[in-house]
Amino acid sequence: FVPYLEGERTPPLPDARGQLDGLTLANMTPANIARATIEGVLWSLAYGVEVLREQTGEISSITLTGGASQSEAVRKIATAVFGLPIVVTDTFESVAVGSARQAAWALTGTLPDWPVPVISTHEPTEADQRAAAEIMERYRSVLATHFGV
């Protein structure tokens, strides 16, 4: 699933639209479509992580927050998609916390040291890392074929 229902920012494709790729009569089940949707959103994020990695160097882990992070299925899929350790926090309102941190930093000039409790961490297996590299290559191929990226 390519989740560009209202365009996309990374890569910059404001007119792109979502699509399900590789559907057949044999695999077109509600469960497969739901999983493809979750994977598509995570692969879109993984593309952004790859861009960041190219610009800044090594990325050591991914932090999941919010409601979807509470799903064990999402955690497992994210571990496989990113091929990196996944850290799950109990901060459901991460945007509000991030905004408050930025405001405190702007007002004091010092980045606040506010600990965020970690619920769990999930380590990728070697198979996860290999699969992530292969699927990212396929994801980039879909982007190139359909969107010229």
What are these regions (language model features)?
Residues F1-V149:
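Glycine/Thr-rich phosphate-binding loops that ligate phosphate moieties of nucleotide
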